[in-house]
Amino acid sequence: MIKPIEYEQLQETLYHEKMSNGLDVYVLPKKGFNKTYAVFTTKYGSIDNRFVPLGKNEMVHVPDGIAHFLEHKLFEKADGDVFQDFSKQGASANAFTSFTRTAYLFSSTSNVERNLETLIDFVQDPYFTEKTVEKEKGIIGQEINMYDDNPDWRLYFGVIENMYKEHPVRIDIAGTVESISHITKDLLYECYETFYHPSNMLLFIVGPVDPEAIISQVRENQGKKPYTDQPEIKREEVKEQEAVFRKEKEIKMNVQGPKCLVGLKSKNPFKLGKELLKHELSMNLLLEALFGKSSAQYESLYEKGYIDETFSFDFTAEYGFGFAAIGGDTPEPDQLAEDISSMLLRAGELITAEKIELARKKKIGTFLKALNSPEYIANQFTRYAFLDMSLFDVVTVLEQITLEDVQNVIQEEIAADRLTVCKVVPKS
């Protein structure tokens, strides 16, 4: 049964149906768009390295980087590469692995039905051989080495490694050359069978499409496939300390000038649904009010020459981990880290209702503009859905957040023992 969900304020109607095999399908028709985006996502990412495989009773520990490895391998079939099928059908295809999910997507202005069929079928039909797995190790090994030479990537993961002692978020998404050497065809099938069941997946389509036609096409496609019900996936719950693992780290690299990131580790990252949405948006308003371009703090850091246009801040919230990262290129990494840390610790007195109001207007404006991008909607929708939130509730919740809500977030989140600094400095 197709269920329309109305979002009157945004004038959007979302169509949803849960297939008999458990697959959630969502369609967002956009009349004025010429491009259609479809994203097929599994709730399986780099942090899912300890779990009970389908049909077994014991927890296993799989090699780091296997989710990303599997993403690469799914595109390869006995008779060639799926990327070529998409391009013959006038579509551009892509995929990515994050900490918590793996997504496969295409965008096209024509042949939407054929491309959608190709997307669903290739993801639901794995083909792994020992030979192709061995070959892929070399390719992904090169990718890993490339990231190892990227100072911004090393800085970002450096700050995460500083924060987390036990949680697998501290492991690079692609793993290491050593860890992927242990990946086998059988391990890939074991991960695939466990995490790529339709009941652990979501298909989202946005564009100038007819929701009834799309959903019945998916229904027909899924009806032909012999899926059986699957028990809930058991993942290991990691015990992680509240305080950061390391207060500071310096990485020497071939860079022109230093880079610095201050990390703030979330205290209680086990929120979902409306509670998480309110928390995340309150945190975003706080960071915008504290460090946005129109803030006194930004001006002071800029005038001292500590920051330039690379300065950025963001807050990542998932189930089981969460953190803010603030910084950029700087000639004075120590002073910048000290200033950012002290601004965070003084946030309670630096924030006013007026500053929150300005931040709110900016955030709502940016969000409404982003809703004109099918790519943005497609990539964000699933993340929200997997955390029991809705992308289309963002404006409503932003409008409701008060100064008191932001002060509560400051009380909960900001403490000296949850702050850490990572620096990348030139080899001298």
Swiss-Prot record:
Catalytic residues (positions): E71
Protein family (similarity comment): Belongs to the peptidase M16 family.
Pfam families: Peptidase_M16, Peptidase_M16_C
Keyword list, A-Z: Hydrolase, Metal-binding, Metalloprotease, Protease, Zinc
Protein name from the UniProt record: Uncharacterized zinc protease YmfH
Organism lineage: Bacteria, Bacillati, Bacillota, Bacilli, Bacillales
Superkingdom: Bacteria
Annotated gene: ymfH
Organism: Bacillus subtilis (strain 168)
Cofactor: Zn(2+)
Gene3D superfamilies: Metalloenzyme, LuxS/M16 peptidase-like (3.30.830.10)
Example of a GO MF term: metal ion binding
